Amino acid sequence: MAAPLAQLRDRFQAALAASFGPEWAATDPLLVPATNPKFGDYQSNVAMSLAKQLGQPPRAIAETLVQNLNLADLCEPPAIAGPGFINFTLQPSYLVAQLQQLQTDERLGIQPVSPPQRVIVDFSSPNIAKEMHVGHLRSTIIGDSIARVLEFQGHEVLRLNHVGDWGTQFGMLIAFLQEQYPQALSQPDALDISDLVAFYKQAKARFDEDPSFQETARQRVVDLQSGEATARQAWQLLCDQSRREFQKIYDRLDIQLEERGESFYNPYLPAIVEDLRRLGLLVEDQGAQCVFLEGFQNKEGQPLPLIVQKSDGGYNYATTDLAALRYRLGQDQAQRIIYVTDSGQANHFAQVFQVAQRAGWLPAAAQIEHVPFGLVQGEDGKKLKTRAGDTVRLRDLLDEAVDRARTDLTTRIAAEERSETPEFIEAVAQAVGLGAVKYADLSQNRNSNYIFSFDKMLALQGNTAPYLLYAYVRIQGIARKGGIDFAQLDPVAAELTEPTERSLAKQVLQLGEVLDEVARDLLPNRLCSYLFELSQTFNQFYDRCPILNAEEPQRTSRLLLCDLTARTLKLGLSLLGISVLERM
C-alpha cells in the first residue's frame, strides 16, 4: 500500500505529462505536507518553479494541472491559492479505506522496497585500548537508527564496526606492558579497559621523554607488522579485552555490529599505493606519496594533498580508508556506503571519495555518503566533560541516566501510593533511562551540536522519550481498563467525525513517507518529530473524544485508532532503538 504522498506524486506526474508533454513526467511535483490545516493536507508550489521554463504565469500552470489531475478517489477537488499554490485535502472515504487496510497489516501498509540495495553502514568505530566515550554515542545510535530504517525498508544492510585496532600506539603500549606489567600480557583477566587507558597515558608520557623507550616501541611496531609471535599475542589480548568492554555497551544499547577493524585491510594497502602510482595519481612530496586534489587547500592557500604513504614507507588512515572503500565496493558489492562519523572528518572523507573517483573505483550508480554529526555539549555550551575536565565515559553516562530514571520513578510511585516490585522498577528505569539518552540525541538534527541535559531528556513533557513512551502506555491502559484485546477487535470502517480523529488517522498513514525521508536524507530527527507530533495528536484525541464510553460503532472505531497509534509508536520507536513499555 503506497503512502498518500506517493500516490499523490504518481497522479501529479501523470498530470504533468498530460498537461505539458511526456518529457515533464519525471518532474518533481514539490509536494509537501501542509503546515496549516486551512490549506488542506498537502501543498505543491511546482507551478511557480515551472513558470520560467514554460513561459506561463504560475496560476495558469496550476489551473492546467488541476484540470488534468485525476484525484476523485483520493482527494477533494484541489484548490489553487495565491500566485499558484495547489492545495490538496484527502477524501474521508480514502482515509477510511486506508485505515482498514492497516488494521490487518503487520507492516502498517509499508511495503518493502523493490529492488532492495546492498548497503553498508559504517558506525561506532571505537579505538582498541581506549574506553568508549560520549563522542561514540552519536555515531553508535545514529548509525544504528539509520541501519534499522533501511533494514525495515527491505534493504540488505551490513553494519560494520571499523575499530581502530592497528597503529604505532600498539608498539608503545606493548613495550610499556612488557616492561612494567608483563603478567598483563599473559593473563586475559589481569586488567580491564580502565587499566589499559591508564597504561596508555603512562606509556605516552614515557614515549615523549625517553628516546630509549621510543626505540623499543618502534621495534615492537616492526615486530607486530612482521607477525612476531609475542607481539601478536600481546596485540590480540589487548583487542580481546577491549572487545569485551565494547560489547557490554552494545548489549546495553541493543546494537548489532560486525567488527572489521583497520587491521583487516593491512594485506590490501600495498596494492592501493601501487595502483595509484600506476594510474599516475601519486606525487612525491617531502618523501611521502601523495594525491593532490581539487578544492583542498591549507590555511596558507597552498594545495592540500592526501598522503597515502608516509616518508618512512608506512601507511595511514587514508590508505586504510581507501582500501576499505575499494573492498566494500568490490568484494562486498555494496551499492550504497554510509559513513557515520563526527563532522571534523568531513574533509578527510571528501578527499578519500575524490581519490576513489579519480582512480575509477566508484561504479557510476554507487552512492557513497559521509553522515557527519556535531558535538555533545554540556549545559555551559562547551564540549561535554567531567568535573575534573576529562572526557565523559559512555558507561558512566548510561549508568547515570538509568539511576536518574529510577529515582524519578520511585518518587512518582510513592506520590501515587502505588506498590511495584523491584523487578518492575528496574525494567522501567533501564528502558526509560537508555531510551531517553538515545532519543535526546536522535531528536536533534545530527549536523548540529546539542546540549546534553538529563533533566530535559527525562521529562514527561516535551519532545522526549518519556513523553512518547507515556502515550503508548496510556493506550495500553485503555485496553486494560476496558478488558480489551486489540488483536481481537473486528475490523470496521473508521468513523472520522471529529477533527482530532481525522488528524490522527492522517498522521498514522504518514509513517511510510517519513521513513522514505529518513532513508533518503539520513536524518533520524525527522522520525522523532513525526512520533512526537503523533503523540501530541493522540493526547488531544484522548482528551476530546470519549473512547470506552462512546456508543457503537464509534467506540470500536476509536479503539482501532488507539491500536493503530500504539502500533505506529512501537514500530517508530523500535527504528530508533527504543523499547516500549506496557506500564510506567
Swiss-Prot record:
SUPFAM superfamilies per UniProt: Anticodon-binding domain of a subclass of class I aminoacyl-tRNA synthetases, Arginyl-tRNA synthetase (ArgRS), N-terminal 'additional' domain, Nucleotidylyl transferase
GO biological process: arginyl-tRNA aminoacylation
Keywords noted in UniProt: Aminoacyl-tRNA synthetase, ATP-binding, Cytoplasm, Ligase, Nucleotide-binding, Protein biosynthesis
Enzyme type, top EC level: ligase
GO cellular component terms attached to this protein's record: cytoplasm
Pfam name, any one: tRNA-synt_1d
CDD domains named in the record: Anticodon_Ia_Arg, ArgRS_core
Annotated GO MF terms: arginine-tRNA ligase activity; ATP binding
Listed InterPro entries: aa-tRNA-synth_I_CS, Arg-tRNA-ligase, Arg-tRNA-synth_N, Arg-tRNA-synth_N_sf, ArgRS_core, DALR_anticod-bd, Rossmann-like_a/b/a_fold, tRNAsynth_Ia_anticodon-bd
Coiled-coil zones: none
Annotated transmembrane regions: none
Assigned EC number: 6.1.1.19
Enzymatic reactions: tRNA(Arg) + L-arginine + ATP = L-arginyl-tRNA(Arg) + AMP + diphosphate
Compartments where found: Cytoplasm
Residue positions of motif 'HIGH' region: 126-136
Organism superkingdom: Bacteria
Family: Belongs to the class-I aminoacyl-tRNA synthetase family.
Annotated PANTHER family: ARGININE--TRNA LIGASE, CYTOPLASMIC (PTHR11956:SF5), ARGINYL-TRNA SYNTHETASE (PTHR11956)
Subunit note: Monomer.
Name this protein carries in UniProt: Arginine--tRNA ligase
Species this protein is from: Synechococcus sp. (strain ATCC 27144 / PCC 6301 / SAUG 1402/1)
Gene name as annotated: argS
